[in-house]
């Protein structure tokens, strides 16, 4: 049995294949996933697992250089937005780098998911609980 943080074989595999600037999406239960993009569906029921639970596990193994959020999260889900900013701050300290945070419209966000290596769908059912993570390097 694997001893590391990520036990899900699909998530572990996609993270291990990421190169510098490749992207990975963690999303809520409602984000449409392009047919051309690998979907890793973790959703069991509403809220399980939560967006933050999935993000915590993914970022424990992934070196993150940039995070992209929909601008709408600021107005429509401010509590999660603040939680995300705190998570990114802690991740910066753990990784020893600065993580750039970019905002885009939700429509542009959805278009950008088509270029991602995979979309990991959580059971989250709150608005705009989505993030695009851009891979950094560990050296």
UniProtKB/Swiss-Prot annotation:
UniProt-listed Enzyme Commission number(s): 5.4.99.62
InterPro entries per record: D-ribose_pyranase, RbsD-like_sf, RbsD_FucU
GO CC annotation terms, alphabetical: cytosol
Keywords in alphabetical order: Carbohydrate metabolism, Cytoplasm, Isomerase
Any one biological process term the GO annotation gives: D-ribose catabolic process
Reactions performed catalytically: beta-D-ribopyranose = beta-D-ribofuranose
Residues of the active site: 20 (proton donor)
UniProt pathway annotation: Carbohydrate metabolism; D-ribose degradation; D-ribose 5-phosphate from beta-D-ribopyranose: step 1/2
GO molecular function terms noted in the UniProt entry: D-ribose pyranase activity; intramolecular lyase activity; monosaccharide binding
Gene3D superfamilies: RbsD-like domain
Primary localization class, coarse: cytoplasm
Coiled coil: none
Entry binding sites for substrate: 28, 106, 128-130
Pfam families: RbsD_FucU (PF05025)
Broadest EC class assigned to this enzyme: isomerase
Keyword Isomerase: yes
Highest taxon above the source species: Bacteria
Compartment list: Cytoplasm
Subunit organization: Homodecamer.
NCBIfam families with a match to the protein in the record: PRK11797.1 (NF008761)
Function summary: Catalyzes the interconversion of beta-pyran and beta-furan forms of D-ribose.
HAMAP family the UniProt entry points to: D_rib_pyranase
Entry's family note: Belongs to the RbsD / FucU family. RbsD subfamily.
Official protein name in the record: D-ribose pyranase
